[in-house]
């Protein structure tokens, strides 16, 4: 899938933006806080029906405005045009349309335009709680497996209902608990099986990217832990019910799964330097891209936001070689350092566009300006 053109009104600090893109490489440079990340976030919104940074849609409306609109004009692999529209008004329901037809369920859109974003916020994958790492698995698997996404939605709905019963000050019949626990167990088993299969297939891809970027300097790994492994999830939920009532929430289940991120045999959270952490995250996301490309029927979009920060020159060079090659489709990349972008452009050749971003205004640079 190629994003040919985007139209943005009142999204974050972007008042009015109309841009035509290169099918290969699109570079955005400017100082921090000018709107580079917001432009990438608008592209992300068109794939995931939400912002990468702020899940509260109304807070993404430009200050002193009442709405935002994002429209993306795409071309599928077979040349078919696709138009995606998102509109949000304060105190109103978000509208999301494909070719002027509104989706009845936003989840039906997920995976239609596969996308991978690498950004400074990825540091939370290492530094943050286990929910960040579960979200990483969810974002990847949901883009190619509708059964997974449906099971995850069912599980989370049942979890909310069970937690409500656990907090109840009135006695609750066991049968009522069982209704939601059986739904959690059934959906949770699906989620567990698919997460386990994904991680097993993903690990060697991730390791190969890390070794390439680091030039074989360190070994990395991933291990997946779940209450569903080697036990009945339903029995675990029933057994934990007494403790859960005391706590007021569910202590067992696939919502507590963990993805351990290792440097050698130790947690990278404890052992990794800034450069190693950044290399780990970039390799993780590039492996995500490669996995989705192998699994799906269309090449994902790749968004690289300030990717070179905290990396030494040799690792920057390895990443430049990777993204300048033919393995990636359409790329959107931001940087405050024009030299980083120029080095990539030199390797890519002629199929690129360069944009200057300043105070929410984004302008394509002419050849003579470059």
Positions of predicted regions on the chain:
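Conserved lysine of the Walker
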Residues: 36
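A conserved P-loop NTPase coupling/switch region
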Residues: 103-115, 119-182, 186, 364-365
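Post-Walker A helix-loop "phosphate-sensing" segment adjacent to the P-loop in P-loop NTPases
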Residues: 44-56, 287-295
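Conserved NTPase motor "head" modules and their coupling/switch loops across ABC/AAA+ ATPases, GTPases
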Residues: 1-31, 172-186, 190-303, 310, ...
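Nucleotide-state sensing region of NTPase/ATPase domains
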Residues: 48-126, 130-132, 141-144, 148, ...
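Conserved short hydrophobic beta-strand within the ABC ATPase nucleotide-binding domain
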Residues: 43, 354-355
């Amino acid at each position: 899938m190629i994003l040919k053109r985007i139209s943005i009104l009142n999204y974050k600090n972007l008042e009015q933006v109309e841009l035509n893109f290169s099918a290969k490489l699109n570079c955005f440079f400017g100082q921090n806080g000018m709107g580079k990340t917001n432009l990438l976030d608008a592209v992300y919104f068109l794939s995931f029906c939400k912002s990468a940074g702020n899940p509260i849609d109304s807070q993404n409306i430009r200050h002193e405005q009442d709405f935002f609109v994002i429209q993306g004009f795409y071309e599928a692999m077979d040349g078919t045009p696709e138009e995606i529209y998102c509109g949000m008004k304060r105190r109103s329901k978000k509208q999301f349309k494909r070719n002027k037809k509104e989706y009845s369920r936003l989840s039906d859109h997920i995976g239609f335009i596969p996308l991978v974003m690498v950004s400074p916020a990825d540091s939370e994958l290492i530094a943050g709680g286990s929910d960040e790492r579960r979200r990483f698995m969810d974002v990847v698997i949901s883009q190619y497996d509708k059964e997974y996404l449906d099971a995850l939605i069912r599980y989370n709905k049942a979890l909310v209902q069970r937690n409500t019963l656990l907090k109840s000050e009135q006695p609750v019949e066991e049968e009522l608990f069982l209704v939601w626990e059986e739904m959690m167990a059934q959906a949770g088993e699906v989620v567990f099986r698919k997460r386990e299969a994904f991680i097993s297939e993903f690990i060697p891809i991730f390791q190969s990217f890390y070794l390439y970027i680091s030039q074989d300097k360190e070994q990395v790994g991933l291990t997946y832990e779940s209450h569903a492994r080697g036990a009945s999830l339903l029995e675990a939920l029933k057994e934990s019910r007494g403790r859960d009532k005391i706590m007021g929430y569910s202590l067992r289940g696939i919502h507590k799964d963990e993805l351990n991120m290792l440097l050698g045999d130790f947690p990278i959270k404890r052992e990794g330097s800034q450069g190693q952490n950044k290399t780990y995250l970039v390799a993780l996301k590039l492996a995500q891209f490669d996995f989705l490309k192998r699994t799906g029927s269309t090449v994902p979009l790749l968004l690289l936001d300030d990717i070179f920060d905290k990396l030494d020159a040799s690792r920057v060079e390895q990443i430049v070689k990777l993204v300048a090659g033919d393995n990636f489709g359409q790329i959107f990349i931001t940087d405050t350092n024009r030299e980083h972008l120029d080095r990539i452009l030199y390797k890519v050749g002629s199929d690129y566009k360069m944009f200057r971003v300043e105070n929410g205004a984004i302008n394509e640079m002419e050849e003579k300006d470059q």
